[in-house]
């Protein structure tokens, strides 16, 4: 079983038209039938020209954008079938660093402080030594 799996994921947006247009509303296909799988510990890079759907696909995987079609699985659980409240419960289990790292990461924080802050957001109380050990374990896991 893949850690992350996308099964024919598509995202279609309605196109903006003028008020006097008599044509049927058009649509823009931002992501068209993407299927992929990522194993635990594997790294995947999305590469493509500007406007090809990389950010839309990433936001869709994070459930910040609903797919028009297809399914997304994380560790075998279908994320696209979750209710909004279930999505909120699962959201701390995955994270995305957006294209502008300065909007996502504080350049004045050390790596330790950044990881510590992420762990603190999960609302689990830890002693100083537990937190230090947890951050060290995370750093070891990512290399």
Positions of the model-derived regions?
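Helix-to-loop junction immediately C-terminal to a conserved catalytic motif
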Residues: 62
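Conserved ABC ATPase "signature" region
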Residues: 78, 129-143
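Q-loop/switch helix immediately C-terminal to the Walker
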Residues: 100, 109-121
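The feature captures the beta-strand-to-loop junction immediately N-terminal to the Walker
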Residues: 47-49
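ABC ATPase NBD coupling module
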Residues: 20-25, 66, 79-95, 121-124, ...
């Amino acid at each position: 079983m893949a850690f992350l799996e996308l099964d024919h994921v598509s995202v279609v947006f309605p196109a903006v038209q003028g008020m006097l247009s008599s044509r049927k509303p058009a649509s823009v296909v931002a992501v068209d039938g993407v299927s992929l799988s990522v194993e635990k510990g594997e790294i995947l890079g999305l590469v493509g020209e500007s406007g090809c759907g990389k950010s839309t696909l990433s936001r869709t995987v994070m459930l910040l954008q609903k797919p028009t079609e297809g399914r997304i699985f994380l560790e075998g659980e279908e994320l696209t079938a979750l209710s909004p409240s279930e999505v909120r419960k699962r959201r701390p289990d995955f994270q995305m660093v957006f294209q502008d790292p300065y909007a996502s990461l504080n350049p004045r924080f050390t790596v330790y402080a950044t990881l510590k802050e992420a762990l603190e957001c999960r609302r689990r109380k830890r002693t100083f030594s537990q937190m230090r050990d947890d951050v060290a374990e995370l750093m070891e896991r990512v290399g």
